[in-house]
């Protein structure tokens, strides 16, 4: 068996995971649909749980697939696979919150895109609902939790912990 050969049952698992991640029932398609719906009705009635679910179904599902596929290919035991899924959920939400903060107060030259688009489009975000200060606190809490979640991997977790820190510290 070479490194390029992946058993059919593993391929099937990977395709199923990708289908779930992209899907209309809790995946990225559902997240985008909910996002567009929330834009049309406004953000005034949104709560933190709804916004977190929305964020999880977008960026979070993509990151979850990457982590979970790696765990499947690496034949990780269930406990490690679950840790990676938990980690991906937290960094996915952190990424989205950081992106929303940067949209509000980032440097347009560094970002390479027009700022304040979320506000102009009435986007349903933690920042629009609760403000930048609360969003920053939540992003830090999620980052700390993500770092803790992968401690199960010992020294091997360092790259994942660095990624979590990068997501919250990035300026573009």
Where are the regions that the model predicts?
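All-alpha prenyltransferase/terpene-synthase fold signal
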Residues: 1-172
